[in-house]
């Protein structure tokens, strides 16, 4: 369950692998909440997920063209699939940057994540009713590179973009606590390579002499190479068997919309929505940003 969740969270290139706060000289913070639902494929049971977390970071220009930044974060998520559930505490560190030359921009970033997982599987069979529990760790690593081109139409700023992202996840082995019905799982690894493209639109509106609002909209499509996670399980010393999880969607449509309020020359407050839709899957998130320029 967690390996599938880790890879699904690592999709969507720049949206997931770097902060959504504007690239600038300053410090910033971001709080977010998201919910997602994955429908059953007829074999594996459907799953729902909710997550809440925050990210903080700092960035700055090292030259006229280059900007580099660092960030860290924490996320708490819950996963539910029928009689199985898990709670996950995730810790994240990462770096990002950009290079701008005339109208062309190259944006890149990556992060490393450590996940502490507590899972529960309820067993109901004849006279047996058990809550099998396990605690184990997982890790994931993600990176992306994106190329964009800014087009100023005077009415709106357009940025067509295309990029590539890669994610790798590793889950440690585990053994549930109930001896009679306990499952054991071997450690497993999986990876996801994705290509994506889309367009961003933005415009700035003056509210007063010192206050303005920047509107942002993005639409995109992503193609994923990874399909279905698999895990080797066994009961006690019995022979192991392979269990397949929910397949990740090959093609995903996503949209973002946001407002950034420039409260002063150095401080901005932003609100953003992000949605992703694919066959049998939908994911929605709300984010709040606070940034202070140097």
What are these regions (language model features)?
Residues 1, 42-50, 82-84, 116-137, ...:
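Solvent-exposed, glycine/polar-rich loop segments of beta-barrel outer-membrane systems
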Residues 1-157, 274, 278-280, 285, ...:
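Outer membrane beta-barrel translocator domains of Type V secretion systems
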Residues 181-294:
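Outer membrane beta-barrel transmembrane domains
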Residues 27-28, 160-164, 215-220:
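Extended hydrophobic secondary-structure segments that form protein cores and membrane-embedded regions
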Residues 147, 158, 163-169:
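Solvent-exposed flexible segments
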């Amino acid at each position: 369950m967690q390996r599938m969740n880790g890879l699904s969270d690592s999709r969507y290139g720049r949206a997931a692998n770097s902060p959504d706060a504007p690239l600038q000289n300053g410090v910033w913070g971001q709080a977010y909440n998201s919910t997602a639902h994955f429908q059953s494929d007829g074999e594996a049971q459907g799953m729902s997920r909710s997550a809440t977390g925050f990210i903080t970071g700092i960035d700055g220009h090292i030259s006229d063209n280059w900007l580099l930044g660092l960030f860290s974060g924490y996320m708490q998520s819950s996963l539910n699939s029928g009689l199985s559930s898990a709670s996950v505490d995730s810790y994240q560190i990462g770096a990002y940057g950009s290079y701008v030359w005339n109208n062309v921009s190259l944006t890149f970033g990556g992060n490393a994540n450590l996940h502490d997982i507590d899972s529960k599987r309820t067993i109901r069979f004849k006279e047996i009713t058990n809550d099998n529990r396990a605690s184990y760790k997982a890790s994931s690593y993600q990176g992306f590179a994106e190329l964009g081109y800014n087009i100023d139409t005077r009415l709106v700023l357009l940025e067509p973009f295309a990029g590539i992202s890669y994610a790798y996840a590793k889950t440690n082995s585990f053994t549930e606590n109930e001896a009679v019905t306990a499952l054991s799982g071997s450690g497993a690894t999986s990876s996801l390579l994705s290509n994506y493209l889309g367009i961003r639109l933005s415009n700035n509106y003056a509210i007063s002499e010192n206050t303005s609002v920047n509107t942002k909209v993005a639409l995109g499509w992503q193609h994923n190479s990874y399909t279905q996670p698999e895990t080797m399980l066994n009961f006690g010393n019995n022979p192991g068997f392979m269990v397949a999880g929910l397949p990740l969607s090959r093609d995903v449509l996503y949209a973002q919309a946001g407002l950034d309020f420039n409260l002063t020359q150095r401080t901005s407050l932003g609100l953003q929505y992000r949605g992703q839709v694919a066959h049998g899957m939908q994911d929605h998130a709300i984010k709040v940003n606070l940034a202070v320029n140097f």
